[in-house]
Amino acid sequence: MSLFPHVRFLLSVADVIQFPPVEGREVAFAGRSNSGKSSAINAITARNALARVSRTPGRTKLLNFFELAPGQRLIDLPGYGYAEAHAEERRQWTQLIEALPERESLTGLFLIVDIRRGIGEQDVQLMEWAAAAGWQVHVLLAKSDKLNQRDRATAFRIAQEQCGEGVTVQVFSAHDRTGVQAAQKRLIQMLASSSSSS
């Protein structure tokens, strides 16, 4: 049984003025292009086609809002680190992202990282930005099915050391469903809280 049986797409946003009203609780999902973010969203919500999965980096170019339940939203952020993105696209993305801390309804960030690549400089910058905004941060080391058990354990340990205190980390695979229930539980906790100090 899905924990989010009534999840639905709300709208795509290309400009700050298109943001929906600030209400309820929201959690953002972010990650590098091709990190497995869309697959993670689909696995966690138990909806195979909720977020569009593409083999082409940079496919998600807008902020996509989804309603998980009344008063609970998920925000799918554009993937970053896409080398072929035009300057105007990067400027647009930056403008949208920088407006998010003003949303008092936004309480947490799920950061999706390809476990084979590990946490990069842009991931660290995003975590620092989220911490400054007062959000809780949870890191999904996605595509864990691509590594053997020993390499997964090593990647997990390194990620924990990089993230430090205050950031939760887990291994995750949308393919074999490793960590899906743990991610769902963490998402529900974030949606129920009011700040990183809760």
Give the residues covered by each predicted segment:
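Residue-level signal for inorganic ion chemistry
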Residues: 66, 142, 183
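Switch II of P-loop NTPase G domains
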Residues: 19, 57-64, 78-107, 115-129
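Canonical P-loop GTPase G-domain recognition
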Residues: 4-16, 146-198
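Conserved C-terminal guanine-recognition region of P-loop GTPase G domains, centered on the G4
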Residues: 98-167
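Conserved amphipathic alpha-helical interaction elements at protein-protein interfaces in regulatory
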Residues: 46-50, 132, 189, 193
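Conserved G1/Walker A P-loop phosphate-binding module
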Residues: 1-84
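Helical mechanochemical/support elements of P-loop NTPase systems and associated helical scaffolds
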Residues: 49, 62, 73, 89-93, ...
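Conserved nucleotide-binding/hydrolysis micro-motifs of P-loop NTPases
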Residues: 59, 72, 79-81, 116-119, ...
